[in-house]
Amino acid sequence: MSTHDILHRLSETLASRRHADPEKSYTAKLFSEGPDSILKKIGEECAELIMAAKDGKRLNIVWESTDVIYHVLVLLAFYGLSIEDVSQEMRRREGISGIDEKASRGTK
């Protein structure tokens, strides 16, 4: 199974949980609490990933990276986006210098 397959399947599963019972689904609970709750979890998981990386513990880095990716996918699904949207943007940027790509976006 490819990385794309597992992320695509997870993305679809998360979207399907949007209207599930928040008492029975952690994902549904996050959706029901809204973007602030999802963003808070992303921040917490990013901090845990940073600490795992600082400690150099490879297995913890994998675990925390998984948590970050999961919560980012929840955020995408909350806004009606998926890993496919991110993949399209990554394909668009492929082969472009990061400096050039950032400059092409202009000011926000």
UniProtKB/Swiss-Prot annotation:
Location within or outside the cell: Cytoplasm
GO cellular component, one term: cytoplasm
UniProt keyword DNA damage present: no
Major location category of this protein: cytoplasm
Keywords assigned by UniProt, alphabetized: Amino-acid biosynthesis, ATP-binding, Cytoplasm, Histidine biosynthesis, Hydrolase, Nucleotide-binding
Molecular function as annotated in GO: ATP binding; phosphoribosyl-ATP diphosphatase activity
Pathway in which the depicted protein is active: Amino-acid biosynthesis; L-histidine biosynthesis; L-histidine from 5-phospho-alpha-D-ribose 1-diphosphate: step 2/9
Record field: catalytic activity: 1-(5-phospho-beta-D-ribosyl)-ATP + H2O = 1-(5-phospho-beta-D-ribosyl)-5'-AMP + diphosphate + H(+)
EC numbers: 3.6.1.31
Biological process terms in GO annotation: L-histidine biosynthetic process
UniProt keyword GTP-binding, yes or no: no
InterPro entries, A to Z: HisE (IPR008179), PRib-ATP_PPHydrolase-like (IPR021130)
PANTHER family xrefs: HISTIDINE BIOSYNTHESIS BIFUNCTIONAL PROTEIN (PTHR42945), HISTIDINE BIOSYNTHESIS BIFUNCTIONAL PROTEIN HISIE (PTHR42945:SF9)
Family: Belongs to the PRA-PH family.
HAMAP family: HisE (MF_01020)
Protein name: Phosphoribosyl-ATP pyrophosphatase
